[in-house]
From Swiss-Prot:
Disruption phenotype: Slight reduction in plant growth. Constitutive expression of pathogenesis-related genes and enhanced resistance to the bacterial pathogen P.syringae pv. tomato.
Residues at the site labelled Critical for catalysis: Y141, K212
The protein, known as: Cytosolic isocitrate dehydrogenase [NADP]
EC number: 1.1.1.42
Designated gene of the protein: CICDH
Amino acid sequence: MAFEKIKVANPIVEMDGDEMTRVIWKSIKDKLITPFVELDIKYFDLGLPHRDATDDKVTIESAEATKKYNVAIKCATITPDEGRVTEFGLKQMWRSPNGTIRNILNGTVFREPIICKNVPKLVPGWTKPICIGRHAFGDQYRATDAVIKGPGKLTMTFEGKDGKTETEVFTFTGEGGVAMAMYNTDESIRAFADASMNTAYEKKWPLYLSTKNTILKKYDGRFKDIFQEVYEASWKSKYDAAGIWYEHRLIDDMVAYALKSEGGYVWACKNYDGDVQSDFLAQGFGSLGLMTSVLVCPDGKTIEAEAAHGTVTRHFRVHQKGGETSTNSIASIFAWTRGLAHRAKLDDNAKLLDFTEKLEAACVGTVESGKMTKDLALIIHGSKLSRDTYLNTEEFIDAVAAELKERLNA
């Protein structure tokens, strides 16, 4: 029986990327998406050569289009360093596309593991996923820091419309040292709170916010207070009805709890904590190649889904020479499924939602049936790894496509 393509009423934004992930991106689209779904795709090429050719305007345009259409699906991209500037002959060292997009969308990045029963976890107690929400604005990432030479007094000045307030920070008496001033805004913290509450409510999981408000009484205290305000005003009754809860915890207490918990909650982290803890979680669950990443905007309606890993340069160099690669495409496939699932929810498209669930199940089912890429086979087999224990890049995508067709025809 021929599969009837699923019609999608509204467009999605596609952001193409670089290197090996660009190669698998095309394969995923050709083998797992377009044969089954009739999509209006607003395409933006965020590959480094095209970003350079457009003076990075394409990145800004893609983010603006995301605001308009509410759903973006993004391939991994290169953030250039000096070496890349030389390699590509770039006009300048362009900023991280992810950073640019996050600043325009003012979103919170949620990362969550994809669990396959046969891939061993470093933390075996984690039987359910832990979704980590990273506030992707301000703090250390927008800070001003300085090296202090010699003795002197460090002060902090704020000039408001009612005049100037000066706060004494420290008096250096010796050789000097270092200093830093950082900030956040009530608007951004409120948006972070709303995105976190919304994500936990959608998943019907409890929500925890971690801070160090015992030390940073005013700074972290503001996060704690705003989260509590947002919860009481907009979410408490919904959470009570769903049998879930919101709680603030100290970061050290939360890290200890995370390690001994079974999972099954959303963890809202400040910017730096989220940067660190999301990698700790990815490794604990088994692999960065099994991690989804979704940027959720404060309107609760706009998202950008992507893989949580880079462009897999090492594999791309082999691919360029015509060699065989075994690159894990699962996180990139899940970028498509999470984006399309959100489109399905916005459009009330049950068929599309069912398709995304079956494609995710086909990915996990393929791995659990023993068909996987080399990185996962290495976690399972270790030193006993041999060529017959894994598939190459295209073979794996073909295996997922076969599994998907079976599930769609069942």
